Amino acid sequence: MEKKTIVLGVIGSDCHAVGNKILDHSFTAAGFNVVNIGVLSPQEDFINAAIETKADAILVSSLYGQGEIDCKGLRQKCDEAGLEGILLYVGGNIVVGKQHWPDVEKRFKDMGYDRVYAPGTPPEVGIADLKEDLNIK
């Protein structure tokens, strides 16, 4: 079976590179073709990389607490760019302060994200979810 391609990056003005490298290594080891666009990435970079590589999913990371601002509108931009239905995952420290997680998760799902991960979620959880969502046995 052909490897599934994912675009991975850290959105907005966030420069947290260590978690990005861990995710890159973990998803690569799990058999995915990872296109890592790095840190400080605007939404357009995720979209352009997904189009260029015919990606199956976009994985957005944010650790500096501003993810809610940075992630708003990405689903709509994906749809406008012809990426309707592409899987969108987001995770990390995606909001400012301690907030009730079910509320945070709902807000991101309402923005069009398929999966939303709390701080400290192990990469293996996202890998298992992605395999399920892409029907990989």
Swiss-Prot record:
Ranges for domain B12-binding: 3-137
Pathway linked to the protein: Amino-acid degradation; L-glutamate degradation via mesaconate pathway; acetate and pyruvate from L-glutamate: step 1/4
InterPro entries tied to this protein: Cobalamin-bd (IPR006158), Cobalamin-bd_sf (IPR036724), GlmS (IPR006394)
Reactions that this protein is recorded to catalyse: (2S,3S)-3-methyl-L-aspartate = L-glutamate
UniProt keyword annotations, A-Z: Cobalamin, Cobalt, Isomerase, Metal-binding
UniProt keyword Metal-binding, yes or no: yes
Residues the entry annotates as binding adenosylcob(III)alamin: 13-17, 61-63, 93-97
GO molecular function: cobalamin binding; metal ion binding; methylaspartate mutase activity
EC category name: isomerase
Keyword Metal-binding (UniProt): yes
GO biological process, one term: glutamate catabolic process via L-citramalate
Quaternary structure annotation from Swiss-Prot or TrEMBL: Heterotetramer composed of 2 epsilon subunits (GlmE) and 2 sigma subunits (GlmS). GlmE exists as a homodimer and GlmS as a monomer.
NCBIfam families: MthylAspMutase (TIGR01501), PRK02261.1 (NF002612)
Function: Catalyzes the carbon skeleton rearrangement of L-glutamate to L-threo-3-methylaspartate ((2S,3S)-3-methylaspartate).
HAMAP family referenced in this protein's UniProt entry, alphabetically: Me_Asp_mutase_S
Identification of the protein by name: Glutamate mutase sigma subunit
